[in-house]
């Protein structure tokens, strides 16, 4: 190990050392960036620094006071920074290179983040005014990110460089796009200053550390429903609190590090009992069973080596089954005790402990890409390089092995594929089992002051410590209820709200204290942190008083609402509630907007289940109920194909996350009005000469659905117990006509909501009304008197379609089940007869399901194809009036199916492939004399439209023997299939 402390390697001004706060190295290890108290960002050449690693000075050849042999040094060694940038107006607290090394992000206490990029065109520019020496490289500012309200403490890039996260003393977590540097999200979730940020090398999580004594882990992934660059979704995965309950608040940084294999997070400034420690968070369960103990003062920075190391232990009999050997990771920790400690996961004791290696607190560290060179900055202004010899830490494994270790967490798959897929969970579960087996050999006896080892594999009952009674009695608020005695001697006890005695203020819905987030376009744009006077720059002195007045006015009228420019609602955080109750901050109070979003998500899932999109064309329900995410592809296809001669208008609203509120089933079906024209039934009365059999009667059915019934007694808050009624606003069905209101006017009550009303007309005479509820209850009543014709029938699911065809009634549920009954012929018949009992449409629909596959070469592409379930729509359902068997025609391929009552299976009546042979023979020549003819014409008409849109290609018959034979065979087969379909019942 070599420790290089070069006198010119650091921040200084006028021969005085200036505090250095941050260092970062680029992806190829050729450039090192540093930032310090002087407000400068300096770029160093690592080759010039590492040259001194192999230098051995001899006393006879020392030519200067620093003991450096100038004769043996190469002329290309640069003993100063390549460039020094001074664009910040404050202390540079953090610098970070992007993963590809193109950009350099620097944060300062001037609340601004600068994005630097090397300018090759001005590499050899002359010395500028005020500079001691000309820069050898030129870095220019590409972006200026303004969003923080206080000092910026830490910066981190995502492993793929697509995201940039900055944290600061304003307790904000701001997420930027790593390409366009637009602000994506801002979260003010922490309750104190945020001092550390680190990304998961598997590109699934990032973690933040704060002075609120917590570490919060966030999961992020791409949204599938959006095509924007900023299509990321962020969720809080876990909160780690236990190791930091007594952590001191004197540290300026809490710089964490994630291990290169993705298994552990090292978090500084933790405590284990009375001593300071470094907490190790396990990725599998976010547990903190391991603590690194040894630092005498709070630790401020941790840094894992970016490479895995392989060691060969001849005494270890256990090897990996795959023969890949044993891997270990290297961790460096430092802090206020001025000591550098290097740990390894191979053993419990540290590898290296360098006491008083510097004369100030160590503020930041970074490893070179080779994993064997460490740079760290210090408050004494110096930057120190620690270089290890080959195989001193272990044998460095290839970077491909790093990627292989991250595969178990889905590092090779795009985050947009599945945020938490079953495959990924299985991989993590397998990795846990392998990890436990390999860690059995590391069960070394724990030294008393070095490390606290994790819990053993065997689950033992915990020792229960005796509870000590607290001598301080708890304050109990005695609750009293008001009791009144009525005139008849009965007691009435007024209910008492228990939460009213609590000191914690609970926001009440509908009060003026409710904080609502107002959307402003400017809230998503970068804004300067400097205040401009209201009346102009020239009146800045006069404008100060106006500023203070405005500030006092805002404090009076907008208390606890100083900063609403955040996206806490996405995480389920309500800023107003957290400010009112800081103690509940860790419990994550859920905001009203989040509850509404979760309710809409559940509501959307319910709508997609109750109203499948494949039944939209056949249903009589409103179209907007079917406009869910599953039919977006169908809508796009209809638009692109221009859908010639389509009589169905596609003016429906596509449902999004915000417009789902507009769909309310209770409101849509609160009132249902149906009008029917029929003739009067005179079969039971004497017909006089003045009677006209063609006189039409208009009957009106009005359904008034009542409110939803309360399931629990606690849900009914609008009534006192003494004033309640058991039967509240039932559903009313009012029937009337325009001929004689007194003769045919009645009201029927139902204890459920009615969704469908179907009048049954036989021989132009109104006979029955069929009513269907939301839950699949079907009731048939007499059109004359409202008398029940049959008992209530339950089909199990909500009804999509009710249809009458002759003497048959067909019902289709959202599960694709078809029921057909034969209606009675009054007065000879009185009861229904079942024809088809719950046959499924799945055999003909699932036959056309398409699940596109993902090729391996497209896995890493941003816009890779995502598997989607493509189910064809049902164009029409009909009933064979001869025997009641259902018929169906599909939209995509125009196939016609019929359910055979004899065979008890779906049979294909029309195969559109045979239409290709009907060049000269019109489809009118094929007739069966029943309802199949109409479906045949519809199928052929759709086939012709597909041909016009070039969706289907035609066969070209060139009058050769082969083509003529094919055409004749196809025509014959088509004719046979039509005839068989007409004969089979």
UniProtKB/Swiss-Prot annotation:
InterPro entries cross-referenced by the UniProt entry: CAF1B_HIR1_beta-prop, HIR1-like, HIRA-like_C, HIRA_B_motif, WD40/YVTN_repeat-like_dom_sf, WD40_repeat_CS, WD40_repeat_dom_sf, WD40_rpt
UniProt feature, compositional bias: Acidic residues: 560-572
PROSITE patterns: WD_REPEATS_1, WD_REPEATS_2, WD_REPEATS_REGION
GO terms (BP aspect): negative regulation of chromatin organization; negative regulation of transcription by RNA polymerase II; negative regulation of transcription by RNA polymerase III; nucleosome assembly; transcription elongation by RNA polymerase II
Pfam families: Beta-prop_CAF1B_HIR1, Hira, HIRA_B
GO MF term (any one): nucleosome binding
Region of interest (Disordered), ranges: 556-587
Cross-referenced Gene3D superfamilies: YVTN repeat-like/Quinoprotein amine dehydrogenase
Function: Required for replication-independent chromatin assembly and for the periodic repression of histone gene transcription during the cell cycle.
Name of this protein: Protein HIR1
Organism: Debaryomyces hansenii (strain ATCC 36239 / CBS 767 / BCRC 21394 / JCM 1990 / NBRC 0083 / IGC 2968)
């Amino acid at each position: 190990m070599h420790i290089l402390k070069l006198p010119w390697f650091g921040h200084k001004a006028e021969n005085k050392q200036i505090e250095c706060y941050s260092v970062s190295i680029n992806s190829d290890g050729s450039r090192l960036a540093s930032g310090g108290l002087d407000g400068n960002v300096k770029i160093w050449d690592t080759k010039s620094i590492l040259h001194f690693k192999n230098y051995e000075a001899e006393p006879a050849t020392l030519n200067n006071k620093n003991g450096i042999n100038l004769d043996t040094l190469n002329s290309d060694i640069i003993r100063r920074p390549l460039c020094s940038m001074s664009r910040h107006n404050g202390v540079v607290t953090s610098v970070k290179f992007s993963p590809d090394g193109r950009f350099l992000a620097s944060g300062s206490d001037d609340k601004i983040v600068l994005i630097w990029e090397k300018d090759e065109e001005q590499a050899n520019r002359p010395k500028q005014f005020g500079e001691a020496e000309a820069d050898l490289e030129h870095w220019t500012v590409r972006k200026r990110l303004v969003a923080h309200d206080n000092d910026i403490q830490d910066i981190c890039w995502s492993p793929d460089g697509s995201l940039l996260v900055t944290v600061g003393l304003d307790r904000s977590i701001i997420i930027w796009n790593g390409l366009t540097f637009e602000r994506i999200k801002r979260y003010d979730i922490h309750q104190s200053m945020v001092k550390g940020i680190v990304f998961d090398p598997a590109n699934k999580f990032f973690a933040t550390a704060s002075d609120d004594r917590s570490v919060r882990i966030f999961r992020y992934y791409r949204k599938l429903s959006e095509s924007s660059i900023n299509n990321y979704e962020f969720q809080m995965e876990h909160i780690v609190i236990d190791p930091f309950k007594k952590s001191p608040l004197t540290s300026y940084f809490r710089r964490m590090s994630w291990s290169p294999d993705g298994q552990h997070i090292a978090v500084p400034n933790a405590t284990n009992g009375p001593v300071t420690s470094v907490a190790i968070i396990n990725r599998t369960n976010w547990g903190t069973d391991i603590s690194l103990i040894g630092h005498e003062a709070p630790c401020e920075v941790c840094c894992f080596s970016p490479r895995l190391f392989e060691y060969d232990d001849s005494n270890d009999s256990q090897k990996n089954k795959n023969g890949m050997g044993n891997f270990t990771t290297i961790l460096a920790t430092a802090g206020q005790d001025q000591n550098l400690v290097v740990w390894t996961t191979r053993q419990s004791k540290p590898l290296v402990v360098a006491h008083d290696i510097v004369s100030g607190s160590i503020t930041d560290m970074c490893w070179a890409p080779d994993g064997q060179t460490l740079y760290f900055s210090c408050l004494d202004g110096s930057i120190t390089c620690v270089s290890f010899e080959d195989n001193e830490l272990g044998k460095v494994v290839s970077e491909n092995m790093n990627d292989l270790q991250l595969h178990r967490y889905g590092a090779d798959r795009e985050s947009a594929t599945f945020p938490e897929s079953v495959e990924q969970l299985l991989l993590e579960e397998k990795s846990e089992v392998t990890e436990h087996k390999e860690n059995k050999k590391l069960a070394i006896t724990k030294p008393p002051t070095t490390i606290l080892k994790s819990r053993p594999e065997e689950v033992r009952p915990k020792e229960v410590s005796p509870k000590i009674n607290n001598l301080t009695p708890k304050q109990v608020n005695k609750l009293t209820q008001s009791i009144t005695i009525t005139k008849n001697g009965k007691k009435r006890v007024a209910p008492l709200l228990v939460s009213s005695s609590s000191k914690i203020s609970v926001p009440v819905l509908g009060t003026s204290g409710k904080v609502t987030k107002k959307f402003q376009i400017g809230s998503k744009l970068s804004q300067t942190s400097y205040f401009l006077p209201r009346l102009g720059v020239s009146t800045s002195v006069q404008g100060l008083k106006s500023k203070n007045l405005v500030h006092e006015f805002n404090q009076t009228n907008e208390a606890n609402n100083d900063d609403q420019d955040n996206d806490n609602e996405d995480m389920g955080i309500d800023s107003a509630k957290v400010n009112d109750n800081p103690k509940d901050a860790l419990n994550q109070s859920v905001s009203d907007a989040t509850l509404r979003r979760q309710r809409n998500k559940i509501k959307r899932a319910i709508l997609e289940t109750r109203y499948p999109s494949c039944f939209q064309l056949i249903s009589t329900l409103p179209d907007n109920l079917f406009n869910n995410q599953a039919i977006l592809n169908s809508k796009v296809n209809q638009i692109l194909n221009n859908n010639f001669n389509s009589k169905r208008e596609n003016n429906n609203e596509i449902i999004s996350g915000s417009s789902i509120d507009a769909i309310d089933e209770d409101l849509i079906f609160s009132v249902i009005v149906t009008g029917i024209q029929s003739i009067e039934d005179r079969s039971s009365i004497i017909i006089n000469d003045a009677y006209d059999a063609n006189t039409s009667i208009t009957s009106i059915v009005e359904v008034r659905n009542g409110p939803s019934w309360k399931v629990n007694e606690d849900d009914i808050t609008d009534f006192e117990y003494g004033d309640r009624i058991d039967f509240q606003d039932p559903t009313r069905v009012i029937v009337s006509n325009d001929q004689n209101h007194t003769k045919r006017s009645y009201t029927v009550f139902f204890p459920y909501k009615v969704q469908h009303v179907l009048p049954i007309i036989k021989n132009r005479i109104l006979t029955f009304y069929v009513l269907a509820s939301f839950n699949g209850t079907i009731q048939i009543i007499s059109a004359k008197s409202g008398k029940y014709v049959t008992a209530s029938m339950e089909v199990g699911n909500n009804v999509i379609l009710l249809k009458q065809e002759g003497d048959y009634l067909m019902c289709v549920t959202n599960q694709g089940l078809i029921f057909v009954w034969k209606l009675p012929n009054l007065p000879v018949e009185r009861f229904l007869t079942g024809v088809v009992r719950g046959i499924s449409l799945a055999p003909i629909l699932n036959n056309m399901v398409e699940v596109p596959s993902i090729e391996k070469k497209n896995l890493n592409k941003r816009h890779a194809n995502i598997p989607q379930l493509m189910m064809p729509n049902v164009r029409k359902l009909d009933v064979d009036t001869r025997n009641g068997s259902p018929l169906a025609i599909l939209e995509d391929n125009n196939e016609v199916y019929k359910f055979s009552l004899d065979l008890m299976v779906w049979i294909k009546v029309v195969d559109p492939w045979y239409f290709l042979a009907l060049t000269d023979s019109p489809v009118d020549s094929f007739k069966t004399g029943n309802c199949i003819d109409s479906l045949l014409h519809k199928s052929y008409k759709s086939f012709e439209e597909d041909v016009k849109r070039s969706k289907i290609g035609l066969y070209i018959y060139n009058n050769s023997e082969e083509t003529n034979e094919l055409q004749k065979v196809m025509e014959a087969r088509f004719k046979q299939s039509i005839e068989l379909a007409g004969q089979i019942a």
